[in-house]
Amino acid sequence: MASDLVVQFGNILEQPTIFPTEKGKVNVVVTNQGDTQLNGPVNLKLYASTDKELDNNNLNTLGPERGANDPLKGTDELLGNLQNQNINLAPGQSQTITVDFAGSEFRTPSVVSPGAYYLFAEVEPGSNITENKANNVANQLITQGDVVIQWNAILLNAIQTSGKGDASGTPPPIGARNQAIVHAAIYDAVNAFDGSHKPYLVDIDPPAGASVQAAAVGAAYQTLKSLYPTQTATFDEQRDRSLNEIIDAPVAEKAGFDFGVKVADQILAARTNDGSAQAQRGYTPGTDPGDFQPIPPGSQPLLPQWGLVTPFAIRSVADFRPEGPPEFSSPLYGREIETVRQLGAKNDTAVTKITRTPDQTEIAQFWANDRDDTFRPPGQLNEVAQEVALAKGTTLAENARLFALVNIAEADAGIVAWDTKYTYDQLRPITAIQNADNDNNPQTKGDPQWDSLLATPNFPDYISGHSVFAGAAAQVLANFFGDNTSFDIPSQELPGVARSYSSFSQLAQEDADSRIYGGVHVPLATVDGVLVGQNVGGFVFDNVLKPI
């Protein structure tokens, strides 16, 4: 046969970081597996993915703006291309290429979660070389942090995978619920070993000598397998990998893992009849001016009964429900709609001239995560928690509590948000703006050709889900680490773009503002959304998982 290049990963010399740090160094080994000499240029491409399947469709490329104006349409990311590397290999010979992410050819990943993701290497010979395309791609799992952070990443990857292709995906409130279930189980399993804090639900003693790390793995594995049964093979593989990396004795690992499974089963049982299975029941649109109308007309809006789901920590949804939006015919609402018309338009029209700045456009895209094949808004905030926890060097027990608090707060914030949405049933800006000539509000200007920069979600405007989730997560993170914490984070929506923050409250505000710039929420829906989220997050932090 002819020459045949095979690629595989060698040593990970320095663990790659998440953009924008741009640190990491890996070896890629290219081998001539054919029976003839290979002499010529090759290209080496590196990609990042949340799973073991490289999706070459709609890949983001680096570009002169490093992705700033090129939102990701697929799920995987091209990290760079080392071009025209001269290879001279006899049959059976290998050559090692060292990829340095601090160099100019490659950037560190943006679209993955730092706890667990895959690097892909692909070797492409020049046009004068025949190549077997079946074996010129290799992957390598990259992990960071302890088992809590790693399994948080596995959880986010599962949420993204659930929305790939024609799959239905995990809507934000459901994602927040699932995240809370997983991390409540991990927390109760880990906390049982030292009992330093109150349990969330399960108060049982672990077996003597059991491995606490294996207990965390067992809790994560069991909950994820129940929540995403079609991905069990992935969870099986990660379970085996996690247990192999634990240095405790096999008997201790088994005892710990089984204990974690036992804890998880009790958490899952407690959520069996929480109302989530009935949340998509029917919805009848209102007929009054200002009532939400499904988008597109006649469709079923998302989760109209989610406000009836049993909360994880708060006592009553009504305790956190805001007073509501201004009257549809009021001058205040008219001014709000005019703000969105000018800031949130997709294109200029005969009526509307966009006033949004390039930075505001980037903010809208950066925080979107509306596509089914992303981590979704609650998951994006979990990635923020991962980044900060890794930077702070928090312990296993601290991470178990941190992620439980963040996700319990997000889950309850989502329930309050959806209760509020369908209580007040406020129409979306796109409907109001396109029909404003008939709304009897002198403050508004109708524009039938107007469209929002971001796709408008199919559920009511007030209050903003993004804002509520951001407020809740930011409040927990601020209480845990201190609000004035500086950090940089990337986005799945804009590979190669990172934004910098000097506080968690700044992050929450920008996430909320993004929905105005995206044209999908009026300002008050975001202002009240952040406040509701902060109230829920503060309550959760002050009332559950407290020190003993």
Regions found by a protein language model. Give the residues of each.
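Acidic/polar surface patches and capping/hinge elements
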Residues: 143-548
